Amino acid sequence: MGKRIAIIGGGNLGTAIAEGLLKSKFSKAAEIIITKRNISTLKSLKEKGIEITDNNNDAVKKSNVIILAVKPFQVEEVLNGIKKDLNTEKILISVVTGGLINEMEEIVKKNMAYFRAMPNTAIAIQQSMTCICSKDADPATIKYVNDLFSTVGKVVTIDEKLMEAATILAACGTAYAMRYIRANIQGGIEIGFDASTASLIAAQTVKGAAELLLQKGSHPEQEIDKVTTPKGCTIAGLNEMEHQGFSSSLIRGIVASYKKIAKD
């Protein structure tokens, strides 16, 4: 039997993680416990064999891995409530936005493996980009946590000092990509497509472009060169976008988001 996993917080993120663990067969239903105050909303998970409870302490006692998936303002209260049930044999993973590892340590006061993981909303369809950092974790534990989050998408290990930047590029980045797709759809409608067809073409084109980079490991400019011809329509469109500040506005937006999160 694998490690028992307690997901503290049965909101959208917590339930998405549970679903990913099940669909990938990383964990059996009997190895997952998920907690929430209102457990009636977790009926579908219960029907799949996952244990649901409103008792955080009971879940932690039964588990080897604890995934903290609560709201940021709840972290201190929840950690204070479960810290007596944590020990050096357990793994604590926070998927809460913000909150440094040393802040968790100061509350828990246990010599154990600590992790922060930053998934994005595509975790709901097992296509997240998750950035992970850790402290006091051995290589085997780091591999285990990476494998766990690989069930819901791609994983990269980073230094904790880059977690805010990861939030911008991976989490906020979803919104940036959606805004590009929305503009693409609007342009498609203007040149003749109905909204439904334009949406499909725009979304699939972006998905295909991303897969080219992921599967081939090529640079974006290499793929751009393949669809641009002298005096062609692609280069005319790209040049007009750049004249209007396409790349610079995106870069400035990313930096503005980072300055905001760093300031707060």
List each model region and its residues.
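Small-residue helix-packing motif on alpha-helices
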Residues: 32, 59, 75, 194-201, ...
